[in-house]
Amino acid sequence: ALAMREDGRSLDETEAQIRAALPDAHLLLIPRTLENLVKNGRAPKLAGQLTQMLNIRLAVSPEWKSGEIKAIKKGRGAKRIVANTMADCLAFLDEHPGSSVRVLTTGAAEEQELVNEALAGQDYVDAGTGPIGCTIATHVGVDAIAISYCPRYQPIH
């Protein structure tokens, strides 16, 4: 939005551009466990128990229109879930070179290193790293990682 404002876009044009880009905006969250998602009513209790018992980790993503959180990938252990999740991100980067990627965590040093390795040599704009905000962190808990990516805004001037 800031780049659009600096580009001389009106508020209505900026809103329209952002709404048009939403289908290509992705947010993938990999919590260590589903415990907090269960506590907050975002995941069924049985799913939380089974994933914990079977050492399965899920990557979840919000459905933009409904607001529901959907499981989109699964894997056993950090390496497998990050590899499975990053496959989508890397395919997106192949299709949309120069896209923005941002990585946020609530710890998750191992997962962050795996994501950095996957992104090495890719054509993307690093939109930064940092902590997951407190609202999302409440839902995903400690040692979670979030990967967001979307096409980069192309100025008209």
Language-model segments: residues:
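Mixed-charge interfacial surface used for oligomerization/domain docking
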Residues: 2-157
